[in-house]
UniProtKB/Swiss-Prot annotation:
Gene name of the record: AGTR1
PROSITE patterns: G_PROTEIN_RECEP_F1_1, G_PROTEIN_RECEP_F1_2
Compositional bias ranges of the Polar residues kind: 337-349
PANTHER family tied to this protein: CELL ADHESION MOLECULE, TYPE-1 ANGIOTENSIN II RECEPTOR A
Subcellular location, principal: membrane
Family: Belongs to the G-protein coupled receptor 1 family.
Lineage: Eukaryota, Metazoa, Chordata, Craniata, Vertebrata
One cellular-component annotation, GO: external side of plasma membrane
Name assigned to this protein: Type-1 angiotensin II receptor
Length: 359
């Protein structure tokens, strides 16, 4: 818990009740190393995703619009990751000034909300494309997808404003270090619990319920399709993919959300024990690594569910340039079921194996 003290030279001086919380030598080595790995892998992977979707696949489908924006949001976050790596390696000493403190903090918050919102919209799009391919054709347009992405970026920007306003550089007098941190003027302030609940509910619980519902309905539709088409072999890979998507999202974010909530309780003074503060402050950067590393892999994960994406991705790795002209395909080509229970369309020759493709 941090207590307010005084202000000098434009930098607020504060006292830390638990100055040793989270300050371990292995954290100062392990976390910067993990950040560096996430930065290299994330920048490389997401840059390739952007190139493949924009230059090779020509951004023709709704799903590709969401994936492109997901990769761009990840890149924006990854560009600030070296700052956090240096910050942690210097034992939580912030050398970059107040403006970069705000920008880097806002980038972390922005990526959280933008990525979660985009994944939620992608799950809704998959549901509409698979379960209601005909009815949703007029709604699942490129214009709607692009407008949705603009709204998502604006919402993520608004959700990140508290980081811009309340994240600042502080000098901790009893440890003699300058940190980039949230600081609340009063323990009675409702702001920290409001921000914490917003992150828990808007940044995880509500999107997870939508994602879980969407893929559960897809699961049921696929099972019904297989029951009707008993003469066709069942492909359990689709069900494994659905399970992987839901569990991947859940276990990536649950640890971070739990420790975020505990951190709010510490900031409010509800938890006073320095041992608990040490556990939370030690675990927090580890949960960040788990959440954001998985987050940065999402564009590749979702992209590789499509055959065309894999084809173009391998072409790019082999330095094969995109074709100047590309024959367009209908947006509704991706992810239609051979049996369409909601649209009363008879079975076709297509198999439901392609239900998660993004081309």
């Amino acid at each position: 818990m941090i207590l307010n003290s005084s202000t000098e030279d434009g930098i607020k001086r504060i006292q830390d009740d638990c100055p040793k919380a989270g300050r371990h030598s292995y954290i100062f080595v392990m976390i910067p190393t993990l950040y560096s790995i996430i930065f290299v892998v994330g920048i490389f992977g997401n840059s390739l995703v952007v190139i493949v979707i924009y230059f090779y696949m020509k951004l023709k489908t709704v799903a590709s619009v969401f994936l492109l924006n997901l990769a761009l949001a990840d890149i924006c976050f990854l560009l600030t990751l070296p700052l956090w790596a240096v910050y942690t390696a210097m034992e939580y000493r912030w050398p970059f000034g107040n403006y970069l403190c705000k920008i880097a903090s806002a980038s972390v918050s922005f990526n959280l909300y933008a990525s979660v919102f985009l994944l939620t919209c992608l799950s809704i799009d998959r549901y509409l494309a698979i379960v209601h391919p005909m009815k949703s054709r007029l709604r699942r347009t490129m214009l709607v997808a692009k407008v949705t992405c603009v709204i998502i970026w604006l919402m993520a920007g608004l959700a990140s404003l508290p980081a811009v306003i309340h994240r600042n550089v502080f000098f901790i007098e009893n440890t003699n270090i300058t940190v980039c941190a949230f600081h609340y003027e009063s323990q009675n302030s409702t702001l920290p619990i409001g921000l914490g609940l917003t992150k828990n509910i808007l940044g995880f619980m509500f999107p997870f319920l939508i994602i879980l519902t969407s893929y559960t309905l897809i699961w049921k539709a696929l099972k019904k399709a297989y029951e009707i088409q008993k003469n066709k072999p069942r492909n359990d890979d689709i069900f494994k993919i659905i399970m992987a998507i839901v569990l991947f999202f859940f276990f990536s974010w649950v640890p971070h959300q739990i420790f975020t909530f505990l951190d709010v309780l510490i900031q409010l003074g509800i938890i006073h024990d320095c041992k608990i503060s040490d556990i939370v402050d030690t675990a927090m950067p580890i949960t960040i690594c788990i959440a954001y590393f998985n987050n940065c892999l999402n564009p590749l994960f979702y992209g590789f569910l499509g055959k065309k994406f894999k084809k173009y991705f391998l072409q790019l790795l082999k330095y094969i340039p995109p074709k100047a002209k590309s024959h367009s395909t209908l947006s509704t080509k991706m992810s239609t079921l051979s049996y369409r229970p909601s649209d009363n369309v008879s079975s076709s020759a297509k198999k439901p194996v392609q239900c998660f493709e993004v081309e």
